[in-house]
Regions:
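Juxtamembrane extramembrane loops of integral membrane proteins
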Residues: 8-9, 13-22, 29, 38
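N-terminal periplasmic "start-of-domain" segments of outer-membrane beta-barrel proteins
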Residues: 19-29, 64-67, 102, 241-242
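Short, solvent-exposed loop/turn elements at domain surfaces
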Residues: 20-23, 32, 53-56, 171
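Flexible, acidic/glycine-enriched loop-and-adjacent beta/alpha segments
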Residues: 33-84, 138-142, 147
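N-terminal type II signal-anchor transmembrane helix
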Residues: 1-13, 52, 72
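N-terminal post-signal-peptidase region of extra-cytosolic proteins
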Residues: 25-34, 48, 107
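Non-catalytic, structured segments within soluble enzyme domains
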Residues: 76-262
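Short, glycine-/polar-rich solvent-exposed loops and beta-turns at beta-strand/coil boundaries
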Residues: 4-5, 24-25, 57-62, 81-82, ...
Length: 262
């Protein structure tokens, strides 16, 4: 299943010359390959979510022992016992069962995923699948939704902000809760510093950056609502609303953008 996974991606409608007229879908997603992701962004997720990702087999015994010790000594459940692979297993395959049953299944599925995919394939799939708030799924969409940028254009502070979202995409949302998001961003930067992914100077500069996130809608190049509605209705008629909206269809019309603008 994971070797040929089809992520839910919105349908896009284009003019003849490739200008975007509209898009339809429940989720905003811009799939990216791992070689398109800036190294500091990869490091931000590793430092925050699973700093031993490239060393373990899908589960991290060291992380599990640490979490158990914290639970025994303080009574608090420590975040971080779930590896990136376990989170991927949860996102794809698991339902809302009792926590201990789900965790056991998570472990076995994670080990299976590690035998099926390479580490880079797992990491890439995770970064494209993960929910990051404001209907943004995957880091490509998050960069666009919060900053109106491509991944390569993000600052270190912005990358850390995005990497802090998986823990609680709504509660830590920089648009709705900027102060909580800033605190979480600085935690991410602190972990990057601890793991020696960034220098003290980079940490100081990034933690002093203001919150710059605000909502960016889809970048529509050509306003033609009548055309896009005709396409939408036809695609829904042919494929049904779920497949039409979530299969990543790119529909090119015969509309000439210069004529439409005139």
């Amino acid at each position: 299943v994971l070797k040929n996974v089809q992520l839910q991606t919105p349908m896009q409608v284009f003019a003849k010359d490739g200008l975007l007229i509209n898009q339809f879908g429940e989720k905003r997603r811009i799939p990216v390959t791992i070689d398109q992701i800036p190294e500091p962004l990869l490091h931000a997720f590793l430092a925050t979510e699973d700093n031993r990702f490239y060393d373990h087999i899908g589960i991290d015994p060291i992380g599990i022992v640490r979490s158990a010790l914290v639970l025994i000594s303080t009574g608090e459940k420590k975040q971080g016992a779930s590896t990136i692979t376990m989170q991927l297993a949860r996102n794809f395959f698991l339902t809302r069962e009792k926590a201990y049953i789900r965790k056991v299944k998570e472990i076995f599925i994670a080990i299976h995923i590690e035998n099926l995919l390479s580490k880079d394939e797992i990491f890439e799939l995770y970064l494209n699948k993960i929910e990051l708030g404001n209907r943004a799924f995957g880091i490509g969409a998050a960069a666009q939704v919060y900053y109106g940028k491509e991944l390569k254009e993000l600052t270190l502070a912005q990358m850390a902000m995005i990497a802090g979202l998986p823990k609680a995409p709504s509660a830590l949302n920089p648009i709705r809760n900027p102060e909580r998001a800033k605190a979480r961003r600085n935690v991410v930067l602190g972990r990057m510093l601890e793991e020696k992914y960034i220098s003290r100077a980079q940490y100081d500069e990034a933690t002093n950056q203001p919150i710059t996130a605000y909502f960016h809608g889809a970048e529509i190049d050509l306003y033609a609502p009548y055309i896009s509605e005709m396409v939408r209705a036809e695609m829904v008629s042919r494929y049904g609303i779920d497949k039409a909206y979530n299969s990543g269809f790119k529909v090119y019309t015969s509309v000439e953008s210069d004529v439409q603008k005139a």
